[in-house]
Amino acid sequence: LPKPPLLPPPVPGLAPGLPPLPVPDPVPHPPKKPP
């Protein structure tokens, strides 16, 4: 059998028995200015 990938699946929920982990934004978005 092929070895499982070291990196977690891109879509949460594919790994059985593991809860989906939240992915925080790498860069905080600035507040949107009103038009």
Swiss-Prot record:
Q: Name one GO biological process term.
A: defense response to fungus
What this protein is reported to do is described as: Antimicrobial peptide. Inhibits elongation of hyphae in B.sorokiniana (IC(50)=3.8 uM) but has no effect on this process or on germination of conidia in a panel of other phytopathogenic fungi. At concentrations above 10 uM, has antibacterial activity.
On modification after translation, the UniProt record reads: O-glycosylated; contains pentose side chains at some or all of the hydroxyproline residues. Glycosylation is required for full antifungal activity.
Task: From the record, give the cysteines joined by S-S bonds.
Answer: none
Keyword annotations from UniProtKB, A to Z: Antibiotic, Antimicrobial, Fungicide, Glycoprotein, Hydroxylation, Plant defense
Query: What is the protein name stated in its UniProt record?
Result: Peptide ToHyp2
Record organism: Taraxacum officinale (Common dandelion)
**Ranges where the record places region Disordered:** 1-35
Q: Which residues carry this modification: Hydroxyproline?
A: 5, 9-10, 12, 16, 20, 31, 35
The annotated regions of Pro residues compositional bias extend over 1-29
Q: Does the keyword Transmembrane apply?
A: no
